[in-house]
């Protein structure tokens, strides 16, 4: 038997139901905020992610699915969505006049990491990217969009905020941080590698010993320039005005190298202590990193598998939907196929091609979680009728075929 690869799984049944539910809500909210759909390729040149995600990131250092294709191109499966969207923005020359684009996307991402609860090697994300807007009000809107999504999904969260500064204040802080790191000994190999490539990423280390060494490290939030400080204070005030609670986390730097200024994470304790379920921030330098004209960008990505895990733990009762259409004798199936074809213009219809007893059909309809049960037997056929049962409300009656749409 051939099985799915480790860390990759089929999406079906209850998982598929929750996936569709999450995407539907995310899409509705994103459209209400003025975002439109974009779809980028699963396969990209490795250079795209080495420039954007950064050489110091675990993704580039350890986790990318990369290979040389038959055309001698060094390619990889996309490990995240932002870089591909920004690449599309530049490729379509939208950066030349700083066009404003608000896009949302969803689909598979790929990272070769240790599979665990809520973390797979092929996983799904929903994300948004807003390009061409420098204003901190857009940062607030992006965060408020996520707040609305989680509110509709019924998911509790903690919001953590930080500012990573800009090209004015970040270099000075980086020098101070490196000086501090050089004064300490005992950092892990990852931290030593990050110190040389992007020292701020050292703050993101999860090693307890390294965190102890970082206890008195200088904080970027205390080293912001006047402009960054003003924007960060404005962002906090907007969130307060909208009733959004948050915590300041001076060591929140996100896992990718392209972030600047606003950085945020949404945390849930429902799938483990401080598990991130969404995160993002501003990346004004990324467009230029990828060869475009200097511009502005902010976005977020949400891990759909983790959201599904939370929803399943809540044991939400899956709502019945659709129509189950069946016959007690095979001679009626052709007639029912004609009825089903007409109904499918407006309704979801599952037609059984097998002639069974009423009890067996009802059992099958229940397994398929359908709401309306319609069956034709000899008596119904003679009277141009159907046996009707609402499986959610437990109502049943005989109805004329001519009245079917009126009843539905």
Swiss-Prot record:
Cell compartments where the protein resides: Cytoplasm
GO terms, molecular function: ATP binding; histidine-tRNA ligase activity
Q: Which residues form a coiled coil?
A: none
Q: What class of enzyme is it?
A: ligase
Q: Which InterPro entries match?
A: aa-tRNA-synth_II, aa-tRNA-synth_II/BPL/LPL, Anticodon-bd, Anticodon-bd_dom_sf, His-tRNA-ligase, HisRS-like_core, HisRS/HisZ
In terms of superkingdom, the source organism counts as Bacteria
Q: Which PROSITE patterns match?
A: AA_TRNA_LIGASE_II
EC nos:
6.1.1.21
Q: Which reaction does it catalyse?
A: tRNA(His) + L-histidine + ATP = L-histidyl-tRNA(His) + AMP + diphosphate + H(+)
A single GO BP: histidyl-tRNA aminoacylation
Enumerate the UniProt keywords alphabetically: Aminoacyl-tRNA synthetase, ATP-binding, Cytoplasm, Ligase, Nucleotide-binding, Protein biosynthesis
**What is stated as this protein's family in its record?**
Belongs to the class-II aminoacyl-tRNA synthetase family.
The record's section on NCBIfam families has:
hisS
Quaternary structure, from the entry: Homodimer.
Protein name in UniProt: Histidine--tRNA ligase
Report the gene name: hisS
